[in-house]
Amino acid sequence: MQSLFEWDFNERKENLEEILKNHIQEFGKEAQGEEFVYELAYGVRDNLAAIDEIIIKHATEWPMDQIPPVDRNVLRLGIFELMFLKQVPPKVAINEAVELGKTFGGESTGKFINGVIGTLYKELEPADIAGVENSEAKDPEQLSTEKT
């Protein structure tokens, strides 16, 4: 989260890899999960346009440039986990984002994050959510035959 914040705060002009290396060296020398940190950061970076479009669609009261940088990057992480990471269950992704928001954001950040990502989650089809296997999703034909 801190690496994405710094990268975004500096208008994405700095090298994300260098920021990550510095933060891991400074804050996470003994931390496990370094690969996961890189997966999250690069995943957000590589899908930034799509993720930001989702934020714009679901945070209609807030233009992107008016969303505080902490909130914006917590949303990006949460949406990336929800939409792209199969190993993270959807409700875990939402909860982690809300808790990050409460920890690093302002007084109402947790509620804001929960509102945006929670609304997105409710709108998604099961096959659209990374933590739900496609085999769990039901197609419309299957639903219509189950009703009869």
Regions from the language model: what does each represent?
Residues 1-104, 108-148:
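N-terminal interaction/assembly modules
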